[in-house]
């Protein structure tokens, strides 16, 4: 049976490698969130148990958002079978106040590309446009869908067998 600390650390490492590495989300700016905001995308951080405040972040993490936090909620040990069952809650955090021109992909006909199109991002003045909107929730659900896909496709996560028959809440 793996130590609890190792189980938590291994899950956080798995999240960083298998989930966070596949998505980039907006890094918040505490002082600007309008047209003056220079949009920056980062891979989410993965944290054990709680999301630290800005003054407690590890050196390689620019902000507590975007992130996923793995919280151990419940556990049990069957001493006879030498079996442990752990329940984790994954808390996702992201931030998106609106759409910046530089994050939009535009199609361009390209007969050599799969499907006949390639895509590019706007640069220059058109990349600096900004539209405040209520679509930031889409980032949250895209992040959640990525987590669900990776969990559903895994038989083992960080050395632990997933009890798929229990489902995901």
Q: Locations of the language-model features?
A:
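Small/polar-rich, solvent-exposed N-terminal microdomains that initiate assembly or binding
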Residues: 1-82
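Intrinsically disordered, low-complexity acidic Ser/Thr-rich regulatory segments
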Residues: 56-64, 126-136
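Generic secondary-structure microfeatures
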Residues: 72-76, 88-96, 151
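Short, solvent-exposed secondary-structure capping/transition elements
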Residues: 78-82, 98-103, 156-160
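Oligomerization/assembly interface segments of phage tail-like spikes and tubes
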Residues: 82-99, 107-129, 169
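Acidic-leaning, charged glycine-interspersed low-complexity segments
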Residues: 132-169
